[in-house]
Curated annotation (Swiss-Prot):
This is Citrate lyase acyl carrier protein. NCBIfam families: citD, PRK13253.1. Oligomer with a subunit composition of (alpha,beta,gamma)6. Keywords: Cytoplasm, Phosphoprotein. It comes from Escherichia fergusonii (strain ATCC 35469 / DSM 13698 / CCUG 18766 / IAM 14443 / JCM 21226 / LMG 7866 / NBRC 102419 / NCTC 12128 / CDC 0568-73). Belongs to the CitD family. Coiled coil: none annotated. The gene is citD. Disulfide bonds: none annotated. Covalent carrier of the coenzyme of citrate lyase. The keyword Transmembrane does not apply. It is found in: Cytoplasm. The modification O-(phosphoribosyl dephospho-coenzyme A)serine is found at residue 14.
Amino acid sequence: MEIIKDALAGTLESSDVMVRIGPCDEPGIHLELESLVKQQFGNAIERVARETLAKLGVERAHVVIDDKGALECVLRARVQAAVMRAAEQTEIQWGAI
């Protein structure tokens, strides 16, 4: 899936996560992570985000994750929503998720 424009999903409320995604000139996923629990769960957060992006077919993007203690299911949903908005997709590919 090609990222066409900047988009975001989520909030900065407690137990949520804000995911910002935009196009990137360089190949690969460039991920920035800010989290209250980065020391403990930073690797897991990054792994979940990268897995979700891979399942959606995103190969090139700049992603900023600002986590406020979100559960894994919330993180996946926010990444999916941001990707759909950034790719200007209206049809959800349930098989990819």
